[in-house]
Amino acid sequence: MVNELTILIKNTTVLDLNKFAAVENDILIEGNKISKIGVDIEVNDKENLKIIDGSNKVALPGLINGHTHVAMTLFRGASDDLPLMDWLNNVIWPSESRLTGEDVYWGSLLGIVEMIKSGTTTFCDMYFFMDEVAHAVEQSGIRAILSRGMVALDPENGEKGLKESIDFIEKWQGKANGRITTALAPHAPYTCPPEFLKDVIWEAKRLNVPINIHISETLDEISIIKERYGTTPVRHLESLGLFEVKTIGAHLVHVDDEEIQILKRYQVGAIHNPQSNMKLASGIAPVAKMLEAGVLVGLGTDGAASNNDLDMIEELRAASYLQKVSSMNPEALNAKTSIAMATSLGARALGLTEVGLLKEGYKADIILLNTNETNFYPRHNIFNLIAYSAKGADVDTVIVDGEIIMEKRQLTRLDEEKIKFEANKRGLKLVAG
């Protein structure tokens, strides 16, 4: 049901990401939408009115985590300092083979708590036991694009994954008052043969859902695709017609200028995961070049096992610093652009049209940062302070779909201590074998 409480945020600094301006305003939320932004807003019906004091706070759109595997919080810290393929083959995949639906449920809740407490209001997920992830999303109040990851090197496994994905989409698309949407998620071009990808494309068109896929993450992947198909991952997927469907492409680390133009032409959402790419030594995505070319670039954390946190404020800062040092240009990926990648541009990359901006008529997905901490003084430039000084712990209040799901750092729907206990118990057992 739509939240019936009217919320009025008074006297706050509102970030306008269309004009890249910060204005002192009130925000009125009615139902699940922002109904008015302005000065000295008055509400006649005060019976169902909640007033939030926005002084010493800045309101910005909820952060959007464009790529993660949220239940992988269960494997955080279990194995680090390994190359991607060693890490997957020797640690992660063996541990994941022991996963149960209940494990994924508690691991997802742990990740969702972490995301809410650091200001994320929407995430795009690819994993297993997705019914359990959906239940966690439904229970928590967060917004998500959910997809069941599919690996099809074994045709029987691919067929099973596609059937489960279709069943999941038909069951969950648009549920939780529209907070849950879905996608088809072939893992990557090196784990999904062409004929399988063609089946996925056909089903995505039939179901009218996007495709969520890892692309060009490592040099090993590039070598595998070149050896098998004589081309690069982006060109390979284009030749199959995959980009004719709305595509969310995670990583896109190793792409050339021609491939960047392909991404632009098809409006592929390129999700940059800077901390995961650095930690696994996958490489540095040419984000500045992509943005200059007009590619829709969002940000993601990847799973907590390869990051190792889900803090999007850290991620937008890492993205900016990485582009600056790799190009030896301090002007690369400035503060305003990195914030946009985590909000408005990130929403466009995922194909979401009603979130990512504080705008009348948009869904009320809003976070309030407490700017009365020492890291926000002196108040020279709020965009610079958010991009380069803020921390996830500065998030004071989180509103999703017009409902307050965290206020003054306290979750309103979830039992954080129980979630930490259950996730810890299960994570330790999974890795121990």
Swiss-Prot record:
Cofactor note: Binds 1 zinc ion per subunit.
TM regions (residue ranges): none
Amino acids binding Zn(2+): 67, 69, 214, 302
Lineage: Bacteria, Bacillati, Bacillota, Clostridia, Thermoanaerobacterales
Pfam families attached to this UniProt entry: Amidohydro_1
EC number, as in UniProt: 3.5.4.28, 3.5.4.31
Keyword Zinc listed: yes
Family matches, as InterPro entries: Amidohydro-rel, Deaminase_MtaD/DadD, Metal-dep_hydrolase_composite, Metal_Hydrolase, MTA/SAH_deaminase
GO molecular function: 5'-methylthioadenosine deaminase activity; metal ion binding; S-adenosylhomocysteine deaminase activity
Annotated function: Catalyzes the deamination of 5-methylthioadenosine and S-adenosyl-L-homocysteine into 5-methylthioinosine and S-inosyl-L-homocysteine, respectively. Is also able to deaminate adenosine.
Catalytic activity: S-adenosyl-L-homocysteine + H2O + H(+) = S-inosyl-L-homocysteine + NH4(+); S-methyl-5'-thioadenosine + H2O + H(+) = S-methyl-5'-thioinosine + NH4(+)
Names of required cofactors: Zn(2+)
Similarity-based family: Belongs to the metallo-dependent hydrolases superfamily. MTA/SAH deaminase family.
Swiss-Prot/TrEMBL keywords: Hydrolase, Metal-binding, Zinc
Species of origin: Carboxydothermus hydrogenoformans (strain ATCC BAA-161 / DSM 6008 / Z-2901)
Gene, per the UniProt record: mtaD
Binding sites annotated in the UniProt record for substrate: 96, 148, 187, 217, 302
Record-given protein name: 5-methylthioadenosine/S-adenosylhomocysteine deaminase
